[in-house]
Amino acid sequence: MVALRLIPCLDVANGRVVKGVNFVGLRDAGDPVELACRYSREGADELVFLDIAASHEARATLVEIVRRTAESVTIPFTVGGGISSIEGITELLRAGADKISLNSSAVKDPGLVSRGACQFGSQCIVVAIDAKRRLEESSGWDVFVNGGRKNTGLDALSWARKVVELGAGEILLTSMDGDGTQKGYDLELTKTISQSVQVPVIASGGAGCLEDVFEAFEYGNASAALLASLLHDQDLTIEEIKNYLLKKNLIIRPTNY
């Protein structure tokens, strides 16, 4: 069995890491490269950078952050946010990113997923899905884009299956209801998607304690857990989380590996 992964998430705006609750109320959380180095030293398995500004000016800043990070850490990292072309993918991969995350651009142009997978390999293409539980009594989740501001009307499960067919090698699944709340991952959402696709699913949105991370793996069937507030606020370290999961008999790469 492949080892389960812990992945710190760095939301970047104007060259700084920021964090909010339910996609709003952003606050400064530090320098992205410094945090990347810290998490790498602590034993993170991978990193994710998401450019939430995604403007033309911000892109140059992001490319520089990617270059500096690639020079400073040896663990794989994914970059996403406003990437809408093969040229954009190429630029960030050349700067040192290992994977590219597509979100709104995949909904607008699904062919970008298949073109990216064809040119760079499925292992390079991650599709990020921001899902929000429907208010009606009917079950299911809607896919949102544009930083969680626009409901596409797409069903999250159907969309997850579609992007895998198109060539996505991984899904970054964020529960908008749980994002930044530290009240636990949406286990039903995570399990539903994880059991329905044949690629790894990264659980995102809501980790607040050790038990939450364990449950994402044990009950949500996630392949990886994305962590933000829990680490940025230094409530827990990656080593503490990994030691806890190892005691729970999960297959995790030790921090002293």
From Swiss-Prot:
Major location (coarse)? cytoplasm
Which compartment or compartments is the protein found in? Answer: Cytoplasm
Question: Which GO biological process entries does UniProt record here?
Answer: L-histidine biosynthetic process
Pathway assignment reads: Amino-acid biosynthesis; L-histidine biosynthesis; L-histidine from 5-phospho-alpha-D-ribose 1-diphosphate: step 5/9
Give the matching SUPFAM superfamilies: Ribulose-phoshate binding barrel
Q: Which Gene Ontology MF annotations are present?
A: imidazoleglycerol-phosphate synthase activity; lyase activity
The record ties this protein, via Pfam families, to: His_biosynth (PF00977)
Q: What are the GO cellular component annotations? A: cytoplasm
Signal peptide location in the record? Answer: none
Q: Which UniProt keywords apply?
A: Amino-acid biosynthesis, Cytoplasm, Histidine biosynthesis, Lyase
Give the annotated active site.
11, 130
Q: Does the keyword Lyase apply?
A: yes
Outline what the protein does.
IGPS catalyzes the conversion of PRFAR and glutamine to IGP, AICAR and glutamate. The HisF subunit catalyzes the cyclization activity that produces IGP and AICAR from PRFAR using the ammonia provided by the HisH subunit.
Q: Could you tell me what this protein is called?
A: Imidazole glycerol phosphate synthase subunit HisF
